């Protein structure tokens, strides 16, 4: 098997396992330099090491074979929600996860036509090729709402809406370490991808704002390396996209009223914290009032009217595009988890994790 060994697959598997070259070397009984040479293609691992590599990294031995479609990503091609607090190893793991999502999407698109990419300014978009949005975040948000025919009111089913416009949205399973260690991120490679993470899934309003934030990165920042300025711009985009100034302003209290903001939270689908900030941003309250409001919110946390709501109660805010594409391919193209696992050289469990589908096994019922 070493004759068809793909060095980039070793790098991908190692990053997915969040292991260093030294870790892999120790498990194999070789030097870190040897692992480095395997990954650069200077040398190849002995055939007898391949099964051990597969065991250590948790992939089938066929995972390392060359010839499968791939899309290599690096950190310059993605925007991380918490860039400064995301260690390099975790960013690399998240990017390797995104690479796998691309491979899965590619495999499904060979069989099923996904929604066309309707994202102005996105280089790969079929609907608005070459079109650009304004560079000002708020103006860009208003223009995208107009192009998507969203009107002036609250945004319902945000994640489903993004998927309907050709954006692949995924949320790693809670069992995936990256779900807890890496905040949301987005990338424009091939087809726009937004990765939402389980660490915000207990609060649907934070989850929706994060999705809108990543949408802002996709339309505003291209492949530019993220920084604090771009994070603020993505926040400004999300605020205007979810709560357009002209629409929300007449409903905001002129004096701080958390009970009223709790009502507006239900209508507009954004957190009370976001609404407090919006009041300050629009000049309705002072910095001092804003600080007192945040202190009061901390005291009210968990009380009736101020309890976070889980994403699990809102189907329109849960990714479903890839799962639905798989289900359609099963029906129309005789696809199965086993077929995808063989084609991608993944374990069946990994395929199910990324598709968010349960293992289907017959239930044995004993007759008494």
State the predicted function of each range.
Residues 1-368:
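Short juxta-domain linker segments that transition from a proline/glycine-rich
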């Amino acid at each position: 098997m070493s004759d068809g060994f793909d060095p980039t697959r070793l790098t991908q598997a190692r990053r997915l396992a969040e292991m260093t070259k030294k870790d892999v070397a120790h498990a194999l009984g070789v030097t870190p330099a040897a692992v480095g040479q395997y990954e650069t293609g200077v040398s190849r691992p002995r055939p007898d090491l391949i099964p051990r590599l597969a065991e250590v990294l948790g992939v089938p031995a066929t995972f390392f074979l060359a010839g499968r479609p791939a899309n290599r990503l690096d950190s310059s091609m993605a925007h991380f929600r918490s860039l400064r607090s995301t260690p390099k190893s975790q960013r690399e793991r998240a990017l390797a996860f995104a690479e796998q999502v691309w491979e899965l999407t590619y495999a499904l698109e060979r069989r099923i036509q996904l929604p066309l990419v309707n994202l102005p300014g996105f280089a790969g978009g079929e609907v608005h090729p070459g079109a650009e949005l304004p560079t000002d975040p708020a103006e860009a948000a208003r223009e995208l709402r107009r192009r998507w025919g969203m009107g002036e009111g609250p945004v319902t089913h945000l994640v489903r809406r993004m998927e309907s416009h050709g954006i692949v949205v995924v949320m790693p399973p809670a069992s995936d370490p990256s779900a807890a260690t890496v905040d949301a991120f987005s990338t424009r490679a091939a087809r726009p991808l937004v990765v939402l993470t389980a660490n915000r899934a207990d609060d649907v309003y934070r989850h929706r704002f994060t999705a809108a934030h990543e949408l802002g990165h996709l339309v505003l920042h291209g492949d530019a390396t993220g920084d604090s300025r771009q994070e603020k711009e993505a926040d400004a985009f999300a605020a205007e996209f979810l709560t357009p100034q002209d629409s929300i302003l007449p409903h905001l209290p002129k004096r701080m009223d958390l009970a009223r903001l709790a009502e507006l939270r239900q209508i507009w689908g954004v957190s009370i914290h976001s609404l407090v900030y919006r009041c300050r941003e629009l000049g309705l309250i002072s910095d001092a009032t804003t600080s007192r409001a945040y202190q009061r919110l901390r005291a009210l946390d968990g009380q009736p009217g101020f309890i976070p709501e889980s994403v699990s109660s809102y189907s329109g805010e849960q990714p479903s595009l890839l799962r639905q594409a798989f289900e359609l391919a099963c029906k129309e193209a005789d696809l199965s988890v086993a077929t995808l696992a063989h084609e991608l050289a993944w374990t069946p469990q990994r395929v199910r994790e990324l598709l968010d589908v349960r293992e289907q096994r017959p239930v044995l019922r004993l007759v008494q």
